C-alpha cells in the first residue's frame, strides 16, 4: 500500500496563491478582446456577427481540446499539462498582436489557439486545489480561486481599454499579458506540487484503481450521475447569460451612451473605451462580493440543510434575471439605473462560481475530476454566436 502523501500547510497555500494568480491571467485573456472590441472591429473591418464568431472560435477550440486535457489531467502529470497550456496561450496571444488587417482569418486562428491553451487550465487547475484541501477549507480556497473569474474578467476590460487609451494602439494590450504569463509559468514550475489524485482525502489507493477505467466508462458513469447532469445544465444556462453579458456589455453601454447623446459613434481608432473601464470595475467589485457571499452562505446554510448549494444557486439566478432585464430595458431612458441593475445582476450571478465548483467536486466521488470539468464545457460552445447575430439585425 502506498505511503500517505502529505504537504506542509504553508506549501499548499502558496500553491493555491500561484494557481489563483494564473486564474486571474487566464480570465484576463478571455475578456481582454471584449474591452477593445470596437477597435478590433474597426481594425479588421468585421461586423458584429463576425466579432461574436471570434469568441465562438475561442470557446469552440477550448471545447475541442478540453477532452484531451481532461484525459491527460486524469492520467498524466497535471503540472506538465498546465505548463504546456500556459506556453500555448501566451505564445498565441502575443503572436496575434502582430497580424495586419488583411489577415483577419489569422487573428481568428490565433484566438482559437489561445482557447486551446486556456482549456488546460480550466479543466485541471481546480482539481489540483481539490487534492490539496478538504471540506470547509476546500470551499474557502475554491471561493478565493473563483473570485478571480470576475476579477480577471474585469481587469481584462480595464487592461485592454487603459493600454489602448495610453498608447493609442489596442495591440499593446495583447503584448503586456505574455510578460505576466511568463512569470506565472516560472512560479508554477517552482512552487506548485502535483499531488496524487485524491491525496487530500487520503484515498490514493482508490484513485489509482479508478484511473484504470476507460474514458468511455467515465462518460457513462457521469451521464448516470443526475446531480452532475443537472448542475451542468444549470451552469450552461448561467454561461449563456454571462457569455453574452461579458462579451457585449461594454459595446452595449457605449451604444447606449451614443443614444443619449453623451458620446459620438466610433468611426476611427482609438475608440472611447470609458464604458469598458466602468464595466470592468463593476465586474471586479461585484465579483468579489458575490463569490464571497455565495461561498459563505453555502458554508453556513449547509450546516442546517444538506441541499444548500443548489438552493443558493437557484435563488441567486432567479433574482439575477429581473435585474439584468431591467438593465437592458432602462438603458435607452435612464443610464444610471441601467448601471445599478447591471451591477446587481452581476453580483447575483457571481454568487454561483465557487458553489457550483464545490458541487462538482462532491458529486464526482473521487473519480475523474478533470473529465468532469471538461464535460461542463460542450453546451456553451455556440453561446456567443446567437447573441452576436442578433446584434446585426
Regions flagged by a language model, labelled:
Residues 33-34, 225-292, 349-353, 357, ...:
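Extracytoplasmic gate region of multi-pass secondary transporters
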Residues 1-9, 198-232, 267:
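Juxtamembrane intracellular "pre-TM" segments in multi-pass secondary transporters
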Residues 1-31:
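Cytosolic juxtamembrane N-terminal segment immediately preceding the first transmembrane helix
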Residues 64-104:
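Conserved MFS/SLC helix-loop-helix module at the cytosolic interface between two early adjacent transmembrane helices
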Residues 110-150:
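Cytoplasmic helix-loop-helix junction between adjacent transmembrane helices
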Residues 92, 104-120, 334-354:
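Hydrophobic core of transmembrane alpha-helices in multi-pass small-molecule transporters
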Residues 87-101, 317-332:
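C-terminal ends and interior cores of transmembrane alpha-helices
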Residues 145-194:
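Helix-loop-helix hairpin linking two adjacent transmembrane segments in secondary transporters
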Amino acid at each position: 500500500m502506498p505511503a500517505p502523501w502529505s504537504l506542509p500547510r504553508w506549501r499548499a497555500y502558496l500553491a493555491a496563491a500561484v494557481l489563483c494568480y494564473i486564474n486571474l491571467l487566464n480570465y484576463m485573456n478571455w475578456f481582454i478582446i471584449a474591452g477593445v472590441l470596437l477597435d478590433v472591429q474597426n481594425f479588421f473591418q468585421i461586423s458584429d456577427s463576425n466579432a461574436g464568431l471570434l469568441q465562438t472560435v475561442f470557446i469552440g477550440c477550448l471545447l475541442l481540446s478540453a477532452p484531451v486535457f481532461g484525459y491527460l489531467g486524469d492520467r498524466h502529470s497535471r503540472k506538465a499539462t498546465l505548463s504546456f497550456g500556459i506556453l500555448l496561450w501566451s505564445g498565441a496571444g502575443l503572436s496575434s498582436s502582430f497580424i495586419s488587417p488583411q489577415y483577419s482569418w489569422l487573428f481568428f486562428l490565433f484566438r482559437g489557439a489561445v482557447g486551446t491553451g486556456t482549456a488546460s487550465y480550466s479543466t485541471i487547475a481546480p482539481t489540483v486545489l481539490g487534492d490539496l484541501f478538504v471540506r470547509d477549507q476546500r470551499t474557502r480556497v475554491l471561493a478565493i480561486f473563483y473570485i478571480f473569474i470576475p476579477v480577471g474578467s474585469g481587469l481584462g476590460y480595464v487592461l485592454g481599454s487603459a493600454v489602448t487609451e495610453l498608447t493609442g494602439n489596442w495591440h499593446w494590450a495583447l503584448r503586456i499579458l505574455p510578460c505576466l504569463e511568463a512569470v506565472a509559468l516560472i512560479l508554477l514550475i517552482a512552487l506548485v506540487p502535483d499531488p496524487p489524485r485524491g491525496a487530500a482525502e487520503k484515498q490514493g489507493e482508490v484513485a489509482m484503481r479508478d484511473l484504470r477505467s476507460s474514458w468511455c466508462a467515465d462518460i457513462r458513469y457521469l451521464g448516470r450521475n443526475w446531480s452532475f447532469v443537472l448542475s451542468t445544465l444549470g451552469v450552461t444556462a448561467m454561461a449563456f447569460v454571462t457569455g453574452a453579458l461579458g462579451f457585449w456589455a461594454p459595446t452595449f453601454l457605449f451604444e447606449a451612451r451614443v443614444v443619449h447623446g453623451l458620446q459620438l459613434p466610433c468611426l476611427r481608432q482609438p475608440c472611447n473605451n470609458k464604458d469598458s473601464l466602468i464595466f470592468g470595475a463593476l465586474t471586479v467589485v461585484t465579483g468579489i462580493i458575490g463569490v464571497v457571499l455565495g461561498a459563505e452562505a453555502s458554508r453556513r446554510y449547509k450546516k442546517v440543510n444538506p441541499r444548500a448549494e443548489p438552493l443558493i444557486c437557484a435563488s441567486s439566478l432567479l433574482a439575477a434575471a429581473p435585474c439584468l432585464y431591467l438593465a437592458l430595458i432602462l438603458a435607452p431612458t435612464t443610464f444610471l439605473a441601467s448601471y445599478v441593475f447591471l451591477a446587481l445582476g452581476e453580483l447575483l450571478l457571481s454568487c454561483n462560481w465557487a458553489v457550483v465548483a464545490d458541487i462538482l467536486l462532491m458529486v464526482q466521488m473521487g473519480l475523474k475530476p478533470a473529465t468532469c470539468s471538461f464535460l461542463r464545457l460542450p453546451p456553451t460552445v455556440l453561446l456567443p454566436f446567437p447573441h452576436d447575430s442578433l446584434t446585426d439585425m
